[in-house]
From Swiss-Prot:
CDD domains membership: enolase
Top EC category: lyase
Catalytic activity: (2R)-2-phosphoglycerate = phosphoenolpyruvate + H2O
The protein's required cofactors: Mg(2+)
Organism name: Thermobifida fusca (strain YX)
EC code(s) of this entry: 4.2.1.11
Full protein name: Enolase
Gene: eno
Localization: Cytoplasm; Secreted; Cell surface
Highest rank taxon of the organism: Bacteria
Disulphide linkage map: none
GO biological process, one term: glycolytic process
Length: 427
């Protein structure tokens, strides 16, 4: 067993040009591993706190305080721990911080250390990270939920819904699914050009045109799927991240130019489900609208996946409330929302034990770190959301999944339509 010999953090840049934390952990057997922390654009108010410096430097977004926390206080605390004792390390980090939201040391400091320790332990054990975390049964390759058209907080456009995604549910392998997604992505670019629309991209690599409505986005993507030679609803399905908290105020939703109630939003989603092969809608309602979530789950929860992101913030306590109240039926998993690997895995386990699906997710501010790809396979979650098949910080995760599928060889199983048990394939 190798123990932690040194911990070092530095400030690096993420995909939006903002600072983030990277941590290196060295073990006494010579192993060195590093992890970099992502950052979100649309963030839930119940997320663990990202420590930023304030002031003029980097527009107040510097992370020198978080870096100092790692290099001083955290390093002093965890040097000497066995790297394979992940839960002990994470527990020590949580105790050292001493706040319920990790606001003293910063979730960005704590998470960087937590992930780097796991990666070092895996390397020391001569195991790929997915195998180290998931054991011998880790074998399911996730459906890539590709955000190919951006709106909301991820793009400077007049489209309310934040993400329009494609899900290659009919592919036979992850490799094939990735190809299908890339082909539709390029088809969509051609479709947008043919309609005289802009083909600039948003934070996550998806196109970000100004459109007349949210339905127009779904129509364009449907056209792109068909023109790429695929069957809509059988080969490739659709999914949304509404990020409704972003346009919720004073008990109402400011959507498509009007103020709407939760009931009116539910009626709108029902119309969409009737019109398009939607397998998943993420954050259809606000993180504070528990009554609306419960009613929506009762009306649509047997037809598609209703994913809690801002609602749950990868927090087992909030997820348990959702389970108890019948709100949502799926968990979005973002490691930096909760701040340690152990708590992340606990949230996934709680979801799966209660027949909630789990979708492993990136953030809009990403790095070349590929840890979430391994987590997706380790947990057999069957779904990953990590952007369009463009921009290297997104593609890095997809390429890592290609490597994992190749390593698993005949043991690899692509989740495909089985990832969405509530959806009846069309076509």
């Amino acid at each position: 067993m190798a123990s932690i010999e040194a911990v070092h953090a530095r400030e690096i840049l993420d995909s939006r040009g903002n600072p983030t934390v990277e941590v290196e952990v060295a073990l006494d057997d010579g192993t060195i591993a590093r992890a970099a922390v992502p950052s979100g654009a649309s963030t839930g108010q119940f997320e663990a706190v990202e420590l930023r410096d304030g002031g003029d430097r980097y527009g107040g977004k510097g992370v020198e305080k978080a870096v100092a926390a790692v290099n001083e206080e955290i390093s002093e605390q965890i040097v000497g721990y066995e790297a394979e004792e992940q839960r002990l390390v994470d527990s020590a980090l949580i105790t050292l911080d001493g706040t319920p939201d990790k606001s003293r040391l910063g979730a960005n400091a704590i998470l960087g250390v937590s992930l780097a320790v796991a990666k070092a332990a895996a390397e020391s054990a001569d195991l790929p990270l997915f195998r180290y975390l998931g054991g011998p049964n880790a074998h399911v390759l996730p459906v890539p939920m590709m955000n190919i058209l951006n709106g909301g907080a991820h793009a400077d456009t007049n489209v309310d819904i934040q993400e329009f995604m494609i899900a290659p549910i009919g592919a036979e392998s992850f490799r094939e699914a990735l190809r299908w997604g890339a082909e539709v992505y390029h088809s969509l670019k051609a479709v947008l050009k043919a309609h005289g629309l802009a083909t600039g991209v948003g934070d996550e690599g998806g196109f970000a045109p100004n459109l007349d409505s949210n339905r127009a986005a779904l129509d364009l993507i449907s056209e792109a799927i068909t023109k790429a030679g695929f069957t809509l609803g059988q080969d490739i399905a659709l999914a949304l991240d509404v990020a409704a908290t972003e346009f919720y105020a004073d008990g109402a939703y400011q959507f498509e130019g009007s103020s709407r109630s939760a009931e009116e939003m539910a009626a709108y989603y029902t119309e969409l489900v009737e019109s398009y092969p939607l397998v998943s809608i993420e954050d259809p309602l606000s993180e504070e609208d528990w009554a609306g979530w419960k009613a929506l789950t009762e009306s649509l929860g047997d037809r598609l996946q209703l994913v809690g992101d801002d609602l749950f913030v990868t927090n087992p306590e909030r997820l348990q409330r959702g389970i108890d109240e019948g709100a949502a039926n799926s968990l979005l998993v973002k490691v930096n929302q909760i701040g340690t690997l152990s708590e992340t895995l606990d949230a996934v386990s709680l979801a799966q034990r209660n027949r909630y699906t789990a979708m492993i997710s990136h953030r809009s501010g990403e790095t070349e770190d590929t840890t979430i790809a391994d987590i997706a396979v380790a947990t057999n979650s069957g779904q990953i959301k990590t952007g369009a098949p463009a921009r290297s910080e997104r593609v890095a995760k997809y390429n890592q999944l290609l490597r994992i599928e190749e390593e698993l060889d005949d043991a690899a199983v692509y989740a495909g339509a089985n990832a969405f048990p509530r959806f009846a394939r069309q076509g």
